[in-house]
Amino acid sequence: MVSLKNWDNKTWLSSNKYIHSFNKFILKQIKLNKYSRVLDIGCGRGKIIANLSSKLNLHYKPIGLDIENHKDKSKKIIFKNTDALSFISKTKLKFDLILIKQTIHLLKKKEIKKLLYICKNKLNANGKIII
């Protein structure tokens, strides 16, 4: 896997306009409710899922994974400084939404296949993976 320290620092990916627009897109793709479980692979600072959590008043804090331990990460999520394959292979949790955004292109083909296979098996009924 590749480490790109602070690659999205102060860019459009962190802008409120982009975050709101992306969450609007997510909510058009999948019906989520306050008891939905959300995982964001390559979450960066976690702003997207933190905003989604606030919007839906999620009961369970969303989980964000990133290989970079950002100092200014959101306090509204459970942040795990780990690689996706390690976490997703070990967790017993199932999710209604798994986001893999701005990340998958950093993986090798073999890692992508393995990650998608494991993610598929970690979805609740009617859960979705959004890439």
What is each stretch, according to the model?
Residues 102-103:
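Short catalytic micro-motifs in class I SAM-dependent methyltransferases
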Residues 35-44:
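Conserved class I S-adenosyl-L-methionine
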Residues 45-86:
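Class I SAM-dependent methyltransferase SAM/SAH-binding core
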Residues 126-131:
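Conserved beta-strand signature within the Rossmann-like core of class I S-adenosyl-L-methionine
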Residues 113-125:
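A short glycine-rich, Lys/Arg-flanked "PGG" loop and its adjoining helix->strand segment in the class I
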Residues 2-21, 25, 29:
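Class I SAM-dependent methyltransferase Rossmann-like catalytic core
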Residues 86-92:
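Short conserved loop adjoining the S-adenosyl-L-methionine
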